[in-house]
Amino acid sequence: MFDPNQQRWRQLSGDEIGALLGRHILDRGPLRPQVLDSSTPKSTEEAAAQAPVLANSIVSSRLLERLCEVRGVGHAATLTGFKWLARVENMSFGYEEAIGFNVDPVNVKDKDGVSAALIFAELAAELKARGTDAIEVLDEIAAEAGVFLTGQVTIRVNDLSELGDVTAKLRQQPPSEIAGSAVTEALDLTKDPLPGTELDEATTTDALIYLTEAGDRVIVRPSGTEPKVKCYLEVVENTPGQDAGREAILDARERAAARPGGAARRHDHSAELRTGTFL
């Protein structure tokens, strides 16, 4: 679609589509709400347990999580794959950054492009009727929750036995800072639980998560389907709030894009990641 901010046509990323669909479902309500027993009054705890939850894989952007936090809605982050997302209780929407969306979890326990396309068409029709478009909605989401810019660096290997070499090296020599910002938290998912969960041996995986003082995040993990190591980068810029004007949002996006994680959207840093100099 045409992006007036960048003055060019471009394809929306999986994270951008996930944020658009997630907000739309928050605004309109779930496609097919969970059937709950309303015959007896519910305690506060029971009501909370039945409240709708939005979810995404751990390697997806944290934008949806922040939006849910702002709106007081439940959110869950899972390991990569819809076999994990489908297990989230009371999920009303779930997605992965690799273009996988579930807008009808009650009936479809997997990603489904047909229902997702229908809901996106519904959103597009509503936006056209209002005289706006998806790019402006992304700016509205940024004003509400902040700018989250994601990128990915990929290292291809010739031998599958090499897949674990990058993560092994990072375990031996973990970075103390990333892009000039101190690392404040490092998680090794072979032994640490996913954020907000308890350790479960069934959910351990070869992945490393680094969070920085600036609020940025780097995740490194071997691909589960291809001979390559993936490095997921995310930079965050706060915005003045829902009253922020378009110029303030554009400034925040430009600041994010100028940083190393944002620049990774446009450049191949495979060589630097192999040697550790990018981190």
Positions of predicted regions on the chain:
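Catalytic core segments in nucleotide and nucleic-acid processing enzymes
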Residues: 25
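Intrinsically disordered, low-complexity polyampholyte segments enriched for Lys and acidic residues
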Residues: 42-46
